[in-house]
């Protein structure tokens, strides 16, 4: 985007693909380095630690995380291209097996084969080509911290806060003006912590609000309307941007009414690096 703004390039095709489901899993078969000493061999272990810390600090109920999983599956069930289209009830979520306690199976994202691509261009170029469906980028932020989860000063405050602050400042809008959020949902706890890091609720209150007021298109915060990583596809990143663009064009399978601004999050590691994107309505 900066290269386009600087006039260095006119267009950029951004692509991603992965075979996480059918490809080699050799890198996950045994722990390495310091993680091996502690018997910690998966990304999920880091998130389980964060999930446990969240429950302990805020006395969070299992139903709070279930509200995230149920909303994602409800949206995925209405998406004909979603990998996981079976609806999930809160009772079924609570009855699900633990994989890495306190995380249950439905707290964890899918493993998927897939790919995605977006075309990035300048406003002038889009106008010259007569593209009235182009979705404008209003704000972008990025921040990161220690890769090692145990070295962070606070497990429940990620660099999502700094990333969002930059993006909202660039966009020049308030948090309550957001029409929907496409949040990186590798695990349900990630969604609750991102909501709080973004300043959409006070600390420790995202789960209760999600349970009471909903994350569907008619709820408090329409969330991951394609099903996200929990239901549509575990192929991370670009699909959330694509769904945000569809929403802002009025082309989504589960459509928010008259959206003006869309919020997208992305991250890597165990909440190690974070990016925030704010998009505006097409046209």
Model-based region annotation:
Residues 1-47, 84-110, 140-145, 158-159, ...:
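Conserved catalytic cysteine-centered active-site region
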Residues 157, 161, 165-188, 197, ...:
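Extended C-terminal subregions enriched in glycine
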Residues 1-27, 175-197, 263:
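Conserved beta-ketoacyl condensing-enzyme motif
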Residues 147-153, 185-208, 219, 270-278:
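Short glycine/threonine-rich loop-to-helix capping motif typified by GTGT followed
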Residues 16-21, 71-72, 141-144, 184-188, ...:
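Acidic, glycine-rich active-site loops and adjacent beta-strand->loop/helix elements
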Residues 66-67, 98-162, 166, 212-226, ...:
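Condensing-enzyme catalytic core mediating Claisen C-C bond formation in acyl metabolism
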Residues 54-59, 127, 163-177, 252:
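Phosphate/pyrophosphate-binding loops at sites that engage ATP/ADP/AMP, CoA/4′-phosphopantetheine
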Residues 1-18, 44-78, 118-124, 232-252:
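Active-site-proximal alpha-helical scaffold in enzymes
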């Amino acid at each position: 985007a900066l290269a386009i703004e600087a006039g260095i390039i006119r267009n950029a095709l951004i692509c991603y693909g992965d075979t996480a489901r059918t490809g080699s899993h050799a890198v996950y078969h045994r722990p390495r380095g310091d993680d091996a000493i502690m018997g910690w061999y998966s990304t999920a272990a880091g998130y389980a630690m964060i999930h446990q810390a969240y429950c302990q600090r805020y006395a969070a109920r299992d139903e709070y995380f279930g509200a995230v999983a149920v909303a994602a599956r409800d949206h995925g069930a209405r998406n004909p291209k979603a990998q996981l289209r079976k609806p999930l009830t809160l009772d079924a979520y609570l009855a699900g097996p633990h994989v890495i306690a306190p995380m249950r199976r439905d707290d964890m994202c899918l493993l998927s084969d897939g790919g995605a691509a977006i075309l990035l261009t300048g406003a002038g170029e889009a106008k010259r080509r007569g593209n009235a469906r182009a979705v404008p980028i209003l704000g972008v932020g990025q921040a990161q911290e220690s890769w090692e989860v145990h070295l962070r000063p606070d497990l429940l405050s990620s660099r999502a806060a700094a990333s969002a602050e930059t993006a909202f400042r660039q966009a020049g809008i308030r948090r309550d003006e957001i029409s929907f959020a496409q949040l990186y949902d590798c695990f349900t706890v990630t969604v609750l912590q991102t909501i709080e890091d973004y300043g959409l609720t006070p600390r420790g209150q995202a789960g209760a609000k999600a349970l009471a007021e909903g994350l569907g298109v008619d709820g408090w915060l329409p969330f991951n309307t394609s099903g996200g990583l929990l239901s549509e596809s575990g192929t991370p990143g670009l699909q959330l941007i694509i769904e945000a663009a569809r929403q802002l064009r009025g082309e989504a399978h589960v459509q928010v009414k008259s959206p003006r601004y869309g919020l997208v999050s992305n991250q890597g590691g165990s909440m190690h690096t974070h990016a925030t994107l704010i998009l505006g309505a097409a046209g």
